[in-house]
Amino acid sequence: MAQSVNIQDQYLNQLRKNHISVTVFLTNGFQLRGLVKAFDNFTVLLETDGKQQLIFKHAISTFSPVKNVSLDKE
């Protein structure tokens, strides 16, 4: 059986590895800006000005990076 591609993990990993700054739009309307430092199935760790924020994925609406992210072709 073919392995399914997890676009979300690929996308977040590229943001993390390439240190791409992002604006994170939350479902309550707030915007957070920073770098993705880590992520798992339920959370994203965002760093802004040396401070970290752990954001639950269910509270995230959109990631808007400052530049396009290319996904690995596997």
UniProtKB/Swiss-Prot annotation:
One of its GO terms (molecular function) is RNA binding. One of its GO terms (biological process) is regulation of translation, ncRNA-mediated. Keywords: RNA-binding, Stress response. SUPFAM superfamilies: Sm-like ribonucleoproteins (SSF50182). GO terms for cellular component: cytosol. The keyword RNA-binding applies. Residues 9-69 form the Sm domain. Homohexamer. PANTHER family: RNA-BINDING PROTEIN HFQ. RNA chaperone that binds small regulatory RNA (sRNAs) and mRNAs to facilitate mRNA translational regulation in response to envelope stress, environmental stress and changes in metabolite concentrations. Also binds with high specificity to tRNAs. Belongs to the Hfq family. This is RNA-binding protein Hfq. It comes from Oceanobacillus iheyensis (strain DSM 14371 / CIP 107618 / JCM 11309 / KCTC 3954 / HTE831). The gene is hfq.
